Amino acid sequence: IVTMLNAMSQGNDGSLSTIHANSSSEVFNRIATYAIQSHERLPQEATNLLIAGAIDFVIFLTRENRFHQGGTMRRYIASVREVNGVDNRVLSSEVFADDGTGHAQPAAPISCVNDLMEAGYDPVATYGTRRRAS
């Protein structure tokens, strides 16, 4: 995990990884647990710095069992969490959250929305009005 975080923070755009966790907020503790078990024995503080420097967003998928309704297993995005920095722990905000119906809805402003817009993100499609960070 330490090697992955180092590779992700080398300045090249675009990284993707998967990890099993029970929520988007639990991902940071899961990474820290793996890092302390690694060969490097990275302490929590150093791991948090690496996480904040390497990860921009955590996208959490969940499953909904619809077998009882004659359906199938449905996977959907339940949470999108933006990493905002570090202060003894990884600071993050849940920018999209499950609305209880299996749809992720806006939950907090995205601090890097201008960067996302430069890459093609359209906040009007999400929010109905253009929202730019100040």
What are these regions (language model features)?
Residues 68-134:
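NTP-binding/hydrolysis catalytic cores, primarily Walker-type P-loop NTPases
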Residues 1-60, 65-85:
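Conserved P-loop NTPase nucleotide-binding/switch module
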